[in-house]
Amino acid sequence: MKIQLIAVGTKMPNWVTMGFEEYQRRFPKEMPFELIEIPAGKRGKNADIKRILEQEGKAMLAACGKSRIVTLDIPGKPWTTEQLATQLEVWKNDGRDLSLLIGGPEGLSAECKAAAEQSWSLSPLTLPHPLVRVVVAESLYRAWSVTMNHPYHRE
């Protein structure tokens, strides 16, 4: 299974890139973890936010192909590390690739939310979108380590 993290926004701060890449490189070859960045639409005081969200959403969905889609969204389901590890096994056994979607400043388009089979909430807090990339990468790596009885995760 290949995991794709599809996120709105490019040109992230160096700490975001370094943090994401630290966990990305730890994933096993049989479970590659890829970041796909979708350019954010231009926002200004006269911007048509609905249209921008639709365009970003279309680009995100096009990048998903036939993979299982899971959105990262506050109203989604929160998982403990152990629950995420179980979920990771379910996704792996499904036989499809996995696309995780992170929206831009206004969130995800209605089309992305409708296409998702699941929605995952990292926290009831609103988190900065760049930080979410790092948190997702670490959380997935930790969940993988649980499934492999790797000593990274300690209870």
From Swiss-Prot:
Keyword check for Methyltransferase: yes
Keywords associated with the record: Cytoplasm, Methyltransferase, rRNA processing, S-adenosyl-L-methionine, Transferase
InterPro entries for the chain: Alpha/beta_knot_MTases, RlmH-like, tRNA_m1G_MTases_N
Location (main, coarse): cytoplasm
GO MF, one example: rRNA (pseudouridine-N3-)-methyltransferase activity
Enzyme class: transferase
Oligomer and partners: Homodimer.
Name of the protein this chain belongs to: Ribosomal RNA large subunit methyltransferase H
Organism: Pasteurella multocida (strain Pm70)
Gene this protein is translated from: rlmH
